Amino acid sequence: MPDTDNTKIIDGRAIAKKVEAEVKADVERLVREKGITPGLSAILVGEDPASKMYVRLKHKACGRVGIFAEDQHLPEDITQEELLEAISSLNARKDIHGILLQLPLPKHLNEQEAMNAIDPAKDADGFHPFNMGQLLIGVEELVPCTPKGIIRALEEYGVEIQGKHAVIVGHSNVVGKPMAAMLVNRNATVSICHVFTKDVTKFTRDADILVVATGVKHLIKEDMVKEGSVIFDVGITEENGKVYGDVDFENVIKKASRVTPVPGGVGPVTIATLMQHVLMSAQKTA
């Protein structure tokens, strides 16, 4: 493996550690002053190994910051009505401040209807239409965790956003669209590319800030990026037991000023942001 310049790597684990330390201190204060322990319930439907792993990682993070965490592990063949009932019971519980619906759900279930059923005040992932609408008018509270984590990383590394050209490759509700809104809220000029964009390279070569979230291994090559750009790689592809991002990291890092690795980049900050959300929701009940 060729040597890479470590000063160019955006260390997601270090940022996550800092965020978790802030959350832990605030959780301890909330317990001490108000007697409230923030609680997160993760709804996991079926036996998908990746989903199980993600829930485990989130539970471990809860343990590190003092948040109570539990699983609602539901069978693969659960009906939509039963899922909505499970969500409704969590909405009513006073000890649960954050609800997380681990996606994807089995194909027979309606994901959007299930997400819409979560109390917006307990929407730990920030996917509820109410919270998405708040984001569009510039109110950033419970917003999708990955874009929020990327904004935190930009701030931590002192990257100027205002007046910069930010390009997002991928237009999902989880990353692309909310990322665009958050960057616009900070006065960036934003371009969104997707599978129907005719010449993606034309956009990526002009990006001061590039966020890539497609799940296509090494989609972004060295000749597609601007000298001195800042790049966030959100994609994950598993192949022969190895994990790859959407960005050809080892070559792109030669040209960029900052790049996130995969793993160890965006992922840890996303989970730390989730912890922030559970804390925020608990603080509002105090």
Curated annotation (Swiss-Prot):
An example molecular function term from Gene Ontology annotations: methylenetetrahydrofolate dehydrogenase (NADP+) activity
Signal peptide span: none
Key word Ion transport present: no
Sorted UniProt keywords: Amino-acid biosynthesis, Histidine biosynthesis, Hydrolase, Methionine biosynthesis, Multifunctional enzyme, NADP, One-carbon metabolism, Oxidoreductase, Purine biosynthesis
CDD domains from the UniProt entry: NAD_bind_m-THF_DH_Cyclohyd
Binding residues for NADP(+): 170-172, 236
Oligomer and partners: Homodimer.
Identification of the protein by name: Bifunctional protein FolD
Organism annotation: Methanococcoides burtonii (strain DSM 6242 / NBRC 107633 / OCM 468 / ACE-M)
